[in-house]
């Protein structure tokens, strides 16, 4: 019985110890880094990507609105497709030129 009691005391002293070990220091650093990443960096990244997304979405939304009005007015699907095709070709050429620079 004595060894079990001593073992229980040893386990309790280890578990209830207030001294920092190397492992606990590393764990605290990892938790702090995780907290910083989720609370600061992730918010900045989302804000940056939201802005970029809105910037790229606005021209597409304008194209949609422009051609949606034309289709509703005319109902001519062929001319609508030709207009969209022309604008998409212009966008593709613009993207190619931007990539070269």
Swiss-Prot record:
Q: Which GO terms describe its cellular component?
A: endosome
Q: Which gene encodes it?
A: BLS1
Family note: Belongs to the BLOC1S1 family.
* Keywords, sorted A to Z: Endosome, Transport
Where in or outside the cell it occurs: the entry states: Endosome
Question: Does the record's keyword annotation contain Nucleus?
Answer: no
Q: What does this protein do?
A: Component of the biogenesis of lysosome-related organelles complex-1 (BLOC-1), a complex involved in endosomal cargo sorting.
What is the name listed in the Swiss-Prot or TrEMBL entry for this protein?
Biogenesis of lysosome-related organelles complex 1 subunit BLS1
Q: Which organism is it from?
A: Zygosaccharomyces rouxii (strain ATCC 2623 / CBS 732 / NBRC 1130 / NCYC 568 / NRRL Y-229)
Q: Which domain of life is it from?
A: Eukaryota
Oligomer status and interactors: Component of the biogenesis of lysosome-related organelles complex-1 (BLOC-1).
Q: What is its main location?
A: other
